[in-house]
Amino acid sequence: MFKLFAALRKERLWDFTGGIHPPEMKQISSEIPLRRIPLPNLLIIPLQQHLGPEGELLVKVGERVLKGQPLTRGNGRTLPVHASTSGTISAISRQVTAHPSGLPELCISLVPDQQDCWGERHPLPDYRAMTPPALIDHIHQAGIAGLGGAGFPTAAKLNGGADRINTLIINAAECEPYITADDRLMREHAAEIVSGCAILSHILAPERVLIGIEDNKPQAIAALRHALQCHEKIQLRVIPTKYPSGGAKQLIKILTGMEVPHGRHSASIGVLMQNVATVYAIKRAVIDGEPLIERVVTLTGEQMHRPGNVWAAIGTPVKHLLQNGGLIAQNKHPMVIMGGPLMGFTLSRLGVPVVKITNCILTPSRDEFSVPQAEQPCIRCGACADVCPARLLPQQLYWFSQGKEHDKARGYHLQECIECGACAYVCPSNIPLVQYYRQEKAEIRALDDEARRAAEAKARFEARLARLEREKAAREQRHKQAAVSVSNSDRETIQAALQRINLRKAGQTDDVAAVNDPRQAALAAAIARAKAKQAGATPAPAATDSDAAAPAPQDDPRKAAIAAAITRAKAKQAGATPAPAATNSDAVAPAPQDDPRKAAIARAKAKQAGATPAPAATNSDAVAPAPQDDPRKAAIAAAIARAKAKAKQAGATPAPATTDSDAADPAPQDDPRKAAIAAAIARAKAKQAASGHATTEPVTVQENTDGARRQIHRATLQAAYASGAGADLTAAAEGATPESDRQAAIATAIARVKARQTLVNGEVPKPVATSTPTDTQKAAVAAAIARIKAKQASAAPSEE
């Protein structure tokens, strides 16, 4: 019946599996009051004293700081650190800190000025008027972390369970041997601890607040009960002494009977736990405005001459604490343990600083701790499994840790190990199981970090590929839209350009240009005619009249001029060597119609070509008529006829008489220009008859040439004057449109060049048959040419 009523009581307690009862050894330091020690000559303040990354530096070397001034900036799970006293920053470097690995970390070296001047503080005495988020942020800026040993940021823990907490547990068990820091703190500052509990209750608003304390601390229990008289919501629970009842999951099981699920936090079941020293630091931060810059540290062990609990500033070297505690070293390198005998670690050097999670400095003698025994093989006794409070299999975890079987160790819940050291305490083979577990955890964390970085790199790579694909798709879409928006004319231009590029590769550029551009077509035609002339250097059948009369393209005079110029140039190149007579098509190639400069160039080239002997021109070359609607060309033809007649009169031997048809072919009377030509021819014949007596005297070729030139020039002027008189009548009668002056100048130049070439060469041409009698102009011109050639033939023997 008694057990039934006890089970129904609210103060019911539960038990956890396993656990041990080692010697407590707390009486060495528990009966000595708290004391303060003087500041050291140098404080070494690590930037990372909690679970999380280090903060951003706010100070620099040589800067003077005040007590409580932030040295780093904290955001999220990054806690700031503060100056433990006023002084000057002497260095910021990496130094060995209080960690089992002994690896150096970034630290701030502060030289105290021994004035201990406080900086600006922000107390909140009326904290009930503040909102929970504001209080949590204030706690975060004070740099408060869990002081029980884990070092988890208190503000992060409060934020994580703000709306789900039903039970708030204050851990005052302090179950590990030798450590009495919390015991002395509760004895001397019980009221402040209760105030801290009230602040947490205001922030979390839990249904109940439980303080769990072991029954081996009667004085602390009495002090707390006295302080809780005015706080009915806060309950004090005294639990049996058993190691490790101070573990978070173990104390939750003892006070509530609930177990925290694997891989989850206590907040998932509505329970939040805080250490009693952390609660005291919260009270000092909120009500007094003091950041976490000092804590209570137990100095104990049989080698300590003045053991006890001291207020140690954060960053105080362990060597300074040992000097204050009166260490009596039994050898040159005494054993110094930071923490308790079960969960602590041996320091590699005594210059490491005190940090926020440092609760004890233990210096045992040889009699306290037996000489370490050599490690022996596991005998599979199972004692470790019996005492494990987490209900794990330490033996299997040991094998997996030895064999580097990380997956199996993870599968056997190695992460649930609280590293209490109970398994190593009972191991008969002296196997340091906790050390193996710590090493295996570190390796697993390293593998997890590497896998996480690889996953992040893969995610970045995949995101980059996705971005490139999106950009490519966007470009293709823009190109498609641009292709759709191209007009028909632009599309034709693009297609023509592509066709030219493709045919240029195949050597067909000229054909494509001729097809797509009329100007290029004319140029191609001229090139073709020039090539035909070059091919005509070898004997070939004469071209038909239809070929000779093929007109050049009339749609663009510039194209025609270009084609004619190219044809003449190639014809002159072919004329440098003896070649057969040109065809009719060569004779009717039109001269440039719109450029006097090209005409001048053609005249110069014709003069150069005339320096070498050339075959006599055919009838088609000689009788190519000028256009019938141009009086200037008619005058030029008449002048040429008169010049040839005079040259015949000046010959050494008499030339054969011309027929009546040659001399008396009248031009049609209905055309004044033709009449002028006929008159000029008649005057030339009369002059020849009058000067017949002078033919017996020899005349040089040079004199004949000069006279012919003067006569050609005079006849040209007279014919131009005569033709000009009837131009207006002809234009009015026939409605013809006169062509440009350039054509007349070109025709005149051609006539002069041909006459000079004939006289200078002095060749004896063959008689040339007259053209069809139906064209009076052609007949007259042919007769004049025949007479000039006969005169040259008669003058040649006389010179010899």
From Swiss-Prot:
The keyword Zinc does not apply. It is found in: Cell inner membrane. It is a peripheral membrane protein. GO terms for biological process: electron transport chain. Residues 536-553, 571-583, 599-617, 647-667, 675-690 have a biased composition (Low complexity). Its cofactor is [4Fe-4S] cluster. Residues 693-705 have a biased composition (Polar residues). Keywords: 4Fe-4S, Cell inner membrane, Cell membrane, Electron transport, Iron, Iron-sulfur, Membrane, Metal-binding, Repeat, Translocase, Transport. GO terms for cellular component: plasma membrane. InterPro entries: 4Fe4S_Fe-S-bd, 4Fe4S_Fe_S_CS, Ion_transpt_RnfC/RsxC, Nuo51_FMN-bd, Nuo51_FMN-bd_sf, RnfC_N, Soluble_ligand-bd. Binds 2 [4Fe-4S] clusters per subunit. Belongs to the 4Fe4S bacterial-type ferredoxin family. RnfC subfamily. Part of a membrane-bound complex that couples electron transfer with translocation of ions across the membrane. This is Ion-translocating oxidoreductase complex subunit C. It comes from Edwardsiella ictaluri (strain 93-146). The gene is rnfC.
